[in-house]
Amino acid sequence: MIYTITLNPAIDLVIITKKLEPNIVNRTENFELQPNGKGVNVSFILKKMGIENVATGIGGGFTLDYITAGLTEKGISNNFLKVKEPTRINVFTRVLDQNQEY
Protein backbone atom coordinates (compact mmCIF):
# COMPACT_ATOMS: atom_id res chain seq x y z
CA MET A 1 0.00 0.00 0.00
CA ILE A 2 1.22 3.48 -0.85
CA TYR A 3 0.59 6.36 1.53
CA THR A 4 0.88 9.96 0.37
CA ILE A 5 1.48 12.74 2.87
CA THR A 6 0.39 16.33 2.29
CA LEU A 7 1.58 18.63 5.05
CA ASN A 8 -0.03 21.72 3.53
CA PRO A 9 -3.10 20.69 1.51
CA ALA A 10 -5.16 23.32 -0.26
CA ILE A 11 -8.24 24.06 -2.26
CA ASP A 12 -7.58 25.74 -5.59
CA LEU A 13 -10.30 28.29 -6.38
CA VAL A 14 -10.22 29.50 -9.98
CA ILE A 15 -12.45 32.51 -10.63
CA ILE A 16 -13.35 32.94 -14.28
CA THR A 17 -14.20 36.43 -15.54
CA LYS A 18 -14.47 38.06 -18.96
CA LYS A 19 -12.33 41.04 -17.99
CA LEU A 20 -10.44 42.35 -14.99
CA GLU A 21 -10.47 46.06 -14.24
CA PRO A 22 -9.11 47.91 -11.19
CA ASN A 23 -11.33 49.79 -8.72
CA ILE A 24 -14.62 48.20 -9.80
CA VAL A 25 -16.55 45.05 -8.96
CA ASN A 26 -15.49 42.40 -11.47
CA ARG A 27 -18.31 39.88 -11.91
CA THR A 28 -17.43 36.23 -12.28
CA GLU A 29 -18.71 34.11 -15.15
CA ASN A 30 -17.97 30.84 -13.36
CA PHE A 31 -15.59 29.24 -10.89
CA GLU A 32 -13.78 25.94 -10.33
CA LEU A 33 -12.84 24.29 -7.04
CA GLN A 34 -10.29 21.50 -6.79
CA PRO A 35 -8.61 19.69 -3.90
CA ASN A 36 -4.86 20.28 -4.17
CA GLY A 37 -1.49 19.76 -2.54
CA LYS A 38 1.52 17.69 -3.63
CA GLY A 39 0.46 14.45 -1.94
CA VAL A 40 -3.21 14.93 -2.82
CA ASN A 41 -2.27 15.33 -6.49
CA VAL A 42 -0.08 12.21 -6.35
CA SER A 43 -3.01 10.28 -4.85
CA PHE A 44 -5.26 11.35 -7.74
CA ILE A 45 -2.65 10.26 -10.30
CA LEU A 46 -2.01 6.93 -8.57
CA LYS A 47 -5.75 6.22 -8.56
CA LYS A 48 -5.99 7.03 -12.29
CA MET A 49 -3.18 4.51 -12.82
CA GLY A 50 -5.16 1.88 -10.90
CA ILE A 51 -2.85 1.97 -7.88
CA GLU A 52 -4.63 1.93 -4.53
CA ASN A 53 -3.30 4.43 -2.01
CA VAL A 54 -4.18 6.30 1.16
CA ALA A 55 -3.95 10.10 1.26
CA THR A 56 -2.78 11.46 4.61
CA GLY A 57 -1.64 14.77 5.97
CA ILE A 58 -2.57 17.64 8.24
CA GLY A 59 -5.44 20.08 7.75
CA GLY A 60 -8.55 21.54 9.23
CA GLY A 61 -11.84 23.32 8.91
CA PHE A 62 -14.43 23.20 6.17
CA THR A 63 -11.62 23.27 3.64
CA LEU A 64 -10.22 19.93 4.79
CA ASP A 65 -13.77 18.55 4.68
CA TYR A 66 -13.94 19.59 1.02
CA ILE A 67 -10.57 17.97 0.27
CA THR A 68 -11.42 14.67 1.95
CA ALA A 69 -14.84 14.61 0.25
CA GLY A 70 -13.10 15.06 -3.12
CA LEU A 71 -10.73 12.20 -2.38
CA THR A 72 -13.54 9.94 -1.18
CA GLU A 73 -15.60 10.77 -4.28
CA LYS A 74 -12.74 9.47 -6.43
CA GLY A 75 -12.48 6.30 -4.32
CA ILE A 76 -9.29 7.31 -2.51
CA SER A 77 -9.02 6.34 1.16
CA ASN A 78 -7.83 9.18 3.35
CA ASN A 79 -6.85 9.76 6.95
CA PHE A 80 -5.85 13.32 7.81
CA LEU A 81 -4.81 14.67 11.20
CA LYS A 82 -7.37 17.39 11.90
CA VAL A 83 -6.23 20.67 13.40
CA LYS A 84 -8.25 23.70 14.48
CA GLU A 85 -7.06 26.10 11.78
CA PRO A 86 -8.63 25.84 8.32
CA THR A 87 -6.64 24.53 5.40
CA ARG A 88 -5.49 27.17 2.90
CA ILE A 89 -7.27 28.28 -0.24
CA ASN A 90 -5.27 29.31 -3.32
CA VAL A 91 -7.13 31.85 -5.47
CA PHE A 92 -6.51 32.27 -9.19
CA THR A 93 -8.30 34.60 -11.60
CA ARG A 94 -8.67 33.50 -15.22
CA VAL A 95 -9.40 36.52 -17.44
CA LEU A 96 -10.98 35.36 -20.67
CA ASP A 97 -10.49 38.46 -22.84
CA GLN A 98 -6.76 38.54 -21.99
CA ASN A 99 -6.29 34.76 -22.09
CA GLN A 100 -4.33 35.17 -18.82
CA GLU A 101 -4.42 33.64 -15.37
CA TYR A 102 -3.33 35.52 -12.25
Language model region names:
Residues 1-56, 65:
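Glycine-rich phosphate/adenosyl-contacting loop at the front of the ribokinase-like
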